[in-house]
Amino acid sequence: MPKGGQKMLDLEQFTGSEQNFITSLGIDIEVITEGVKYLIENTDIKQALNVIFASIQANPTMQDEGFLVIRLIQEPKRIFVKIEDGNDNILDSFPLDKIELPKEQLDLWYVNNTLLLPSEY
């Protein structure tokens, strides 16, 4: 079992993207992939994604980016979020209440209004 009681999820099973979903999961994202749908259904990440996407929607620079890296880092008492442009330039960063992530660092990519796991690109 991963450190800190993290729930083990097999996210590596999602490669390529065979099916996309218009989100009906209560988050402000237009399209998600199978891997992200699985992640949302099997973890408590939904509320964190709502906060992250509120930040993106409030920032015109991030809205204009065609590619964003959303990095969630598990810390002892919180999650730390970094939103980058894909070239290690941090566009925003902030702490969130602790949730259990499937691993100590979870990266998600937001590409042309679609949220996906890096392995699904």
Predicted regions and their residues:
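N-terminal "domain-start" segment
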Residues: P2-D92
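Short, compact, well-ordered microdomains
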Residues: K82-Y121
